Amino acid sequence: MGSEMCIRDSHNSGFVSPVDVLTQNEINQSINEIENFEEETGQPIDFPHKSRCHQLFAWADYLVHHPKILDAVEDIIGPNILCYHATLWVKPAKSNSFVRWHQDGTYFFLDPAKHVTAWVALTVADEDAGCMQVIPGSHKNDFIDHNDDADPNNMIPRGQGLAIEVETEAAVGMPLQAGQMSLHHTKLFHASFNNMRDTRRIGFGISYIPTEVKDIGNTPANALLVRGEDKNNNFLPEKRLADPESQDQFDYHLSLMKQFRKRQDEGASFSKAKLND
């Protein structure tokens, strides 16, 4: 996808999709590493390991630094790029898992709201698999009030969703093949619904921000420089993954996650992702 088209679509509709980014070998490597970890632990990958997983796993570190992903992100937010967060989204086969209509940046406490999410499909993420649904142009709204819910099938840790009626007749799907990604604005209304396929739907969502964005949260935020230079130093600097899946790395990851969840869950009426201090 050319730079001008990427910029235009992002400005007009709030999203860009699909964008080809990964080779089959890169897809296989990511899936193999995820499945190896699951085999070692004896259970499907879940919180906290699925969150900020670029600080645990080589495949995730590779993807947050992937040049094709960063080239497309740079078209939208410029050359100096921080990774603010990243999450592995796994919908089991034939599951009731869903994500409510929401705006990503509601509890990110970033100013200005120039955050963009790259959602990378590691398996097929079509309509049957519960691909992302978006409301084109909704990113031109301000942040709308959200509320929390405790539905165990809601994949968002604090269960947040828009506290308004969403005009879903305007929604469009963003189906992706494995190896493709979508990009969407932090204010874009989006959701996803049940996976009706016989296989898991696996996607990797990466939150990118330009270095000039300021942290306005009560709890300071960490961020990882992935391209360019950071002359602003608005975030606590994060070290790049050094020793994948080592005890030292697990400890560092846990410290980052405690900081992040404290920040994200402030004022939450419910959270599936609280971590003890």
Where in the sequence are the language-model features?
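A short beta-loop-beta micro-motif enriched in histidine and acidic residues
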Residues: Q103-H115, E169-A170, L176-Q177, T199-R200
